[in-house]
């Protein structure tokens, strides 16, 4: 027989961002615990609110299965010595089955006698096993934890009650001074405590006390109520998934309402209004039918519709206070020219080991000028870059960004427009921060892309030069995100940048023009290049390339993200072609021969030493590929497909490791040329060939 098992942890209000992940953790740990203890069940359903983490184990077996089985042990000659005494092997076998040597008997199997025991064990009751739920609670982890009273135990928030019901039976799990029972708590202000007769009563019992325990149901209620409001007023609302998740986990009984503010505040940039509403107050901003931001907002209260007018008025008052501040900051900032703010940047620290923001911008200017030539950026766009790189951090010292730090770059764009800067310059100020997250939007302009790469590259060079290198577990300055941003922008723009090749030139340009420490030698430069190159793997994983393709292309000596991606595309595209396996096997054979011979000497191939026409054919084919300076990775692969029969014929017709040392080395030199070309695609030996 089976019963449903309910387990609820009642707490003080938890931060919204930990609720969903915490109840999932509780379910996952319980699932593992039940499986380890041999208790079968159908599924585990989760419930969660800011004040509770709950699981309902559906169709849980009432007890473990009984054990009735015969266990085979060591042969008799190992189980007993010549005098018939039990050996350690026999004793260990019996002990491992929870029995003694008195329980051992012997039976013959294929001419040999073996030790056996008959194990009969009654399964434990589920209620006994579920007493261990307290250990699951103790094992849970959180970003931040609290202690209460004089206990050493830590949890995300103090625990006030627990419910533990197996069907209608209480399983009295105990943690500190809290003993689980059948009483749960309703809404803090609208509901009362409620005694549950059965585990299955949980959801409906809480609804009667103004608690919607199912998070998905609460989310659905919020969405439906928002849509009703929107339809009534012909509004549009962008439902931010993160904000929706947050407000769902802030309330137990959601009621949606609309508020408004004075139209005069609409002169403030939209991003400021949205930040004030969404980030500070957890409101949804509202747009008219044409997508223009209007002076209304939508919010969610934790309660019913009683006294809703008072709630609306209170929320409007709080928002207007924020908007008054924003209006003041905006008006103050507009009083000054950009040069006023730029001049202050020499006194703003980028990092105390690196220098000022002004010095950082100066280095970015140098890096961008260098990269602009590499990327063949137009003269007009480089003129815009020169201007924006001299000013783009100015908004860091504005009043608005001082209050709304998340708007750095955004306010710079708006203030630059107000002072008459070119649109390319204004937009690039905002885009210098992009992408703002791992998979965030990329710059839309060439100038913005160049500025963003130069800014991120200087940041990485400067921090590495100062010895502040990320560890495997710690990256306080988000250098990995910066490196990944560089890779994504390069790939998006189609810009070729073999980082290991350009770093020495860049550092030479920066030398003597900055007080910041720079990488001191080739080893330090290579560390930076490898750090950036490692982020290419992240992009390939995001684009769902096969693991062996990723391993292969990253094992090459190729440094240019564009070429690495091209190699991955080519190998992935042709992976299932009929000729893929023979091509890869031929090239891998060459690699293995060179490794075995330990041949790395890039000597010139001497055609006078050729002894067979196959050598001439291979030489001609390889030379044709080498001489094509515009050869793409895709065309290189096609070239190898055509060359594959030639390579096979070469192996059939020649002894590579010839007795004549000159002939042997000449043939190895030929193979090395092939291998160097193949290396542009990757280490093909890492490919899984079917």
Swiss-Prot record:
Cited InterPro entries: DALR_anticod-bd (IPR008909), Gly-tRNA-synth_bsu (IPR015944), Gly-tRNA-synth_heterodimer (IPR006194)
Official protein name in the record: Glycine--tRNA ligase beta subunit
Catalytic EC class: ligase
EC number of the protein: 6.1.1.14
Assembly behavior: Tetramer of two alpha and two beta subunits.
GO molecular function: arginine-tRNA ligase activity; ATP binding; glycine-tRNA ligase activity
Membrane-traversing stretches: none
Source superkingdom: Bacteria
GO biological process: arginyl-tRNA aminoacylation; glycyl-tRNA aminoacylation
Main location per the UniProt record: cytoplasm
Gene Ontology cellular component list: cytosol
Gene designation: glyS
Location in or out of the cell: Cytoplasm
NCBIfam families per the UniProt record, alphabetical: glyS
UniProt similarity note: Belongs to the class-II aminoacyl-tRNA synthetase family.
Pfam family name, one: tRNA_synt_2f
SUPFAM superfamilies referenced in this protein's UniProt entry, alphabetically: HD-domain/PDEase-like
Catalytic activity line of the entry: tRNA(Gly) + glycine + ATP = glycyl-tRNA(Gly) + AMP + diphosphate
Keywords, in A-Z order: Aminoacyl-tRNA synthetase, ATP-binding, Cytoplasm, Ligase, Nucleotide-binding, Protein biosynthesis
């Amino acid at each position: 027989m089976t019963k449903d098992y309910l387990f609820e942890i009642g707490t003080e209000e938890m931060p919204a961002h930990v609720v969903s992940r915490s109840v999932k953790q509780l379910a996952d740990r319980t699932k593992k615990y039940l499986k380890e203890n041999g208790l079968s069940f159908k599924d585990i359903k989760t419930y969660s609110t800011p004040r509770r983490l709950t699981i309902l184990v559906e169709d849980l077996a009432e007890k473990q299965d009984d054990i009735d089985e015969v266990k085979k042990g060591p042969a008799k000659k190992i189980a007993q010595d010549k005098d018939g005494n039990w050996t350690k092997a026999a004793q260990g076998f019996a002990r491992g089955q929870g029995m003694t040597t008195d329980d051992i008997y012997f039976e013959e199997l294929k001419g040999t006698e073996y030790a056996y025991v008959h194990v009969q064990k009654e399964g434990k009751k589920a209620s006994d096993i579920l007493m261990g739920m307290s250990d699951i609670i103790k094992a849970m982890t959180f970003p931040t934890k609290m202690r209460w009273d004089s206990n050493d135990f830590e949890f995300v928030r103090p625990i006030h009650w627990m419910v533990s019901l197996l069907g209608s039976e209480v399983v009295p799990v105990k943690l500190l001074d809290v003993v689980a029972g059948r009483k749960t708590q309703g809404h803090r202000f609208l509901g009362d405590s409620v005694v549950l007769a059965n585990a299955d009563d949980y959801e409906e019992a809480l609804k009667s006390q103004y608690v919607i325990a199912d998070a998905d149901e609460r989310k659905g209620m919020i969405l439906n109520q928002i849509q009703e409001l929107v339809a009534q007023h012909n509004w549009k609302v962008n439902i931010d998934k993160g904000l929706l998740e947050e407000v769902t986990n802030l309330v137990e009984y959601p009621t949606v309402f609309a508020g408004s503010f004075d139209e005069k505040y609409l002169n403030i940039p939209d991003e400021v209004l949205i930040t004030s509403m969404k980030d500070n107050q957890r409101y949804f901003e509202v747009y008219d039918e044409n997508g223009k931001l209007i002076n209304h907002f939508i919010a969610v209260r934790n309660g019913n519709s009683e006294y809703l007018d008072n709630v609306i008025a209170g929320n409007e008052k709080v928002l207007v206070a924020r908007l008054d501040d924003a209006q003041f900051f905006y008006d103050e900032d507009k009083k000054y020219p950009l040069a006023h703010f730029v001049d202050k940047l020499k006194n703003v620290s980028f990092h105390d080991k690196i220098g000022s923001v002004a010095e950082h911008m100066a280095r970015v200017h140098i890096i961008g000028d260098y990269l602009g030539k590499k990327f063949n950026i137009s003269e007009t766009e480089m003129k815009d870059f020169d201007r924006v790189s001299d000013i783009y951090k100015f908004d860091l010292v504005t009043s608005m960004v001082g209050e709304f730090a998340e708007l750095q770059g955004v306010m710079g764009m708006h203030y630059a427009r107000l002072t008459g800067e070119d649109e390319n310059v204004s937009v690039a100020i905002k885009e210098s921060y992009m992408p703002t997250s791992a998979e965030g939007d990329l710059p839309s302009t060439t100038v913005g892309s160049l500025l963003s790469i130069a800014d991120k590259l200087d940041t990485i060079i400067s921090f590495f030069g100062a010895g502040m290198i990320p560890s495997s577990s710690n990256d306080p300055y988000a250098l990995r995100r910066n490196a990944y941003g560089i890779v994504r922008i390069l790939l998006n723009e189609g810009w070729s940048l073999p980082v290991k090749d350009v770093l020495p030139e860049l550092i030479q340009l920066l030398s003597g023009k900055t007080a910041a420490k720079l990488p001191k030698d080739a080893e330090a430069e290579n560390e930076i290049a490898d750090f950036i190159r490692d982020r290419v793997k992240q992009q390939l994983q995001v684009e769902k390339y096969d693991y062996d393709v990723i391993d292969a292309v990253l094992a090459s000596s190729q440094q240019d993200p564009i070429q690495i991606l091209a190699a991955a595309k080519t190998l992935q595209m042709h992976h299932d072609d009929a000729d893929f396996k023979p091509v890869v096997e031929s090239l891998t054979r060459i690699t293995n021969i060179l490794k075995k011979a330990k041949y790395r000497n890039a000597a010139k191939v001497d055609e006078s030493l050729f002894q067979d026409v196959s050598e001439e054919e291979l030489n001609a084919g390889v030379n044709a590929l080498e001489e094509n300076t515009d050869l793409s990775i895709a065309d290189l692969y096609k070239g190898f497909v055509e060359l594959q029969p030639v390579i096979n014929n070469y192996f059939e017709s020649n002894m590579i490791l010839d007795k004549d040392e000159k002939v042997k080395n000449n043939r190895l030199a030929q193979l090395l040329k092939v291998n160097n070309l193949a290396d542009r695609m990757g280490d093909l030996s890492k490919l899984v060939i079917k």
